[in-house]
Amino acid sequence: MSSTQVGNALSSSTTTLVDLSNSTVTQKKQYYKDGETLHNLLLELKNNQDLELLPHEQAHPKIFQALKARIGRINNETCDPGEENSFFICDLGEVKRLFNNWVKELPRIKPFYAVKCNPDTKVLSLLAELGVNFDCASKVEIDRVLSMNISPDRIVYANPCKVASFIRYAASKNVMKSTFDNVEELHKIKKFHPESQLLLRIATDDSTAQCRLSTKYGCEMENVDVLLKAIKELGLNLAGVSFHVGSGASDFTSLYKAVRDARTVFDKAANEYGLPPLKILDVGGGFQFESFKESTAVLRLALEEFFPVGCGVDIIAEPGRYFVATAFTLASHVIAKRKLSENEAMIYTNDGVYGNMNCILFDHQEPHPRTLYHNLEFHYDDFESTTAVLDSINKTRSEYPYKVSIWGPTCDGLDCIAKEYYMKHDVIVGDWFYFPALGAYTSSAATQFNGFEQTADIVYIDSELD
């Protein structure tokens, strides 16, 4: 987008913005008052080749070594039941790199990791060491964090609708920060935890998100006055505002609008209801590695306009998948095969949608199987061993002659990992697939449906160490 186009799009705005931090998009821009201008900014960012993704694939060799070592110890013809179960490789070095990238891109925003995303103890411990705080939504999650000798002031109880006994428990453990979005919740808090530091959760436009949350949580802006009035009448402590624009959003103008709406609530609380100045803005979660540059650019713009440096407001966020999705690789064993024709088959693995790939159902993810081990040979280095889509130029049927559907181990017909995939190799029983980037909302929601245990082992590596 040329500077002339930027100027024309922003002609109605009067404020000037400093350059985008930590990127090569350094020309000055005026603040963004309309959706078209934000859309143009996002197009510019998507087309800017200088804004590169974090090179997380540099860890591949160590991941392969760990996969190879684990599989090399398994003989599926003689092993005990369960020894050939699926397992994860967790790269703690990837978590470190992602944290450093967060600090670089969003230095003002303190992350509170969403424990529900992946409650692995070693990941939680590492994040705590790095200075990350925690977003908990239940007694169990609070317990998990506190059991690691983490101070309760590093927890936000980010569930707007809480069980009364959990509120009492939070009070007994001095967990003070808590979200709400309705009057009834305020009455419970007044009764069981009246000293809470409350964050009013507002609804957002998450219509482009894959995982929408405002259909369930968040007070609409037209109803904010009801909650502010109740806060004042009950004598409770309103500390700030929170929101969540959903996960997998394709339009980050929703972030800008949410920050703008939060500013409205801040001003309304002080000017119309005489409440003490609010001190916390919680910008929620939904951050994804693949779209981090776009979402953070818009977020920085919005914060600089509505909550500039020195405004006296602490900015926090609730990232989950951002820190763990690309840090975990799942390995799954081929347990059966049903041939349909010469080059077409149904493949069955020992993990599926009721296990560590429940993210297919609940999180709208599409795991990408790759060939790890075929016919006694490893193929990890071939990142193009499989494809979901054929075309006439780059990925042809002659290169990928074998068409398969991939299924989980349970007896439910819903347990399908991929309805159509194309393979370079004719998969056989005893082979292994690996699925990269399966660290978010996978093991945390696995079930034991049909009697299949899903306590997948985790092998830890650290690609940041020599």
Swiss-Prot record:
It comes from Saccharomyces cerevisiae (strain ATCC 204508 / S288c). This is Ornithine decarboxylase. It comes from the Eukaryota. The modification N6-(pyridoxal phosphate)lysine is found at residue 116. Pyridoxal 5'-phosphate binds at residues 247, 286, 318-321, 441. Pathway: Amine and polyamine biosynthesis; putrescine biosynthesis via L-ornithine pathway; putrescine from L-ornithine: step 1/1. Its cofactor is pyridoxal 5'-phosphate. Present with 688 molecules/cell in log phase SD medium. Inhibited by antizyme (AZ) OAZ1 in response to polyamine levels. AZ inhibits the assembly of the functional homodimer by binding to ODC monomers and targeting them for ubiquitin-independent proteolytic destruction by the 26S proteasome. GO terms for cellular component: cytoplasm. Catalyzes the first and rate-limiting step of polyamine biosynthesis that converts ornithine into putrescine, which is the precursor for the polyamines, spermidine and spermine. Polyamines are essential for cell proliferation and are implicated in cellular processes, ranging from DNA replication to apoptosis. Signal peptide: none annotated. Belongs to the Orn/Lys/Arg decarboxylase class-II family. Its EC number is 4.1.1.17. It is an enzyme of class 4 (lyase). It is found in: Cytoplasm. One of its GO terms (biological process) is pantothenate biosynthetic process. PANTHER family: ARGININE/DIAMINOPIMELATE/ORNITHINE DECARBOXYLASE, ORNITHINE DECARBOXYLASE 1-RELATED. GO terms for molecular function: ornithine decarboxylase activity. The active site is at 411 (proton donor). Keywords: Cytoplasm, Decarboxylase, Lyase, Polyamine biosynthesis, Pyridoxal phosphate. Its main location: cytoplasm. The record marks 244 as: Stacks against the aromatic ring of pyridoxal phosphate and stabilizes reaction intermediates.
